[in-house]
């Protein structure tokens, strides 16, 4: 059985999972966190499920070698493609994935119209269709794929005219259709929440699942007697792209400067 002091592995296709990592560290400050951003293979949203599964297997294997006690797939697209596969490979491992917040959005909407901003891979998945079938029968859900946003966020671009224009083009049709609740269905998108909030009326709710994932991780660790005790844990970072690129963006998205190592698998 893993030690309580063992680390937790958190992965994303790039830097979007840092939004989830922040929620985990906020809720579980004693945990040691290992973060792999698969930036050399981004964007996952345009890749095949088989390709994504293979990348997730490699990263999960790395976490296992590092002695991780649990893993978080901090990526909606990776969860869709690989979570079932990884649960078969590591049946005793607490493993938490992401999914768009359809259930809370359907409960929150007053107009009966919910908008979803996500990658093509997430929106076209059977898992997303099942979420709609289970939780959104009584509301209208309008989906909006958002090509280009992930790449801008990966570059640390959160406020430029280019990102503003692109986001506006994706959001305006949803507002015109009567959406009063917007789901951020990609872990990159919470970094654009301040920009998005300035584009929508005050009564439009913006929902993502980072905090809910942190709570689920806390529940699973507690149920397996794996919650860390003692001093505050640290975070360590790896990337499959140029480490210097992630080093430069960490102060923007993580609000701290940390060393970044190369992940060559």
From Swiss-Prot:
Keywords: Cell shape, Cell wall biogenesis/degradation, Isomerase, Peptidoglycan synthesis
Catalytic site positions: 75 (proton donor/acceptor), 186 (proton donor/acceptor)
SUPFAM superfamilies, A to Z: Aspartate/glutamate racemase
Pfam families membership: Asp_Glu_race (PF01177)
Gene Ontology MF term list: glutamate racemase activity
Function: Provides the (R)-glutamate required for cell wall biosynthesis.
NCBIfam families per record: glut_race
Stated family: Belongs to the aspartate/glutamate racemases family.
Record-given protein name: Glutamate racemase
Organism, as annotated: Pseudomonas putida (strain ATCC 47054 / DSM 6125 / CFBP 8728 / NCIMB 11950 / KT2440)
Organismal lineage: Bacteria, Pseudomonadati, Pseudomonadota, Gammaproteobacteria, Pseudomonadales
């Amino acid at each position: 059985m893993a030690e309580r002091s063992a680390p937790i592995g958190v992965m994303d296709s790039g830097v979007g999972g840092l939004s989830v990592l922040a929620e985990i560290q906020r809720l579980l400050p004693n945990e040691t966190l290992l973060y792999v951003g698969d930036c050399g293979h981004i964007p996952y949203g345009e890749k095949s499920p088989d390709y994504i599964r293979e990348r997730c297997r490699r990263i999960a294997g790395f976490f296992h070698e590092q002695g991780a006690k649990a893993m978080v797939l901090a990526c909606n697209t990776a969860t869709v493609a690989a979570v079932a596969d990884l649960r078969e490979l590591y049946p005793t491992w607490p493993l938490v994935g992401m999914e768009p917040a359809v259930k809370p959005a359907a409960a929150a909407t007053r107009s009966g119209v919910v908008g979803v901003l996500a990658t093509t891979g997430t929106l076209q998945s059977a898992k997303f269709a099942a979420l709609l079938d289970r939780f959104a029968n009584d509301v209208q859900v309008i989906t909006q794929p958002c090509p280009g946003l992930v790449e801008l966020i990966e570059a640390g671009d959160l406020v430029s005219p280019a990102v503003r224009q692109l986001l506006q083009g994706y959001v305006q049709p949803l507002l015109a259709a009567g959406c009063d609740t917007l789901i951020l269905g990609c872990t990159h998108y919470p970094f654009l929440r301040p920009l998005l909030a300035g584009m929508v009326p005050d009564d439009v709710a913006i929902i993502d699942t980072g905090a809910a994932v942190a709570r689920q991780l806390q529940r699973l660790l507690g149920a397996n007697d794996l919650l860390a005790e003692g001093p505050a844990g640290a975070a360590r970072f790896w990337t499959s792209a140029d480490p210097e690129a992630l080093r430069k963006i960490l102060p923007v998205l993580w609000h701290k400067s940390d060393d970044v190592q190369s992940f060559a698998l």
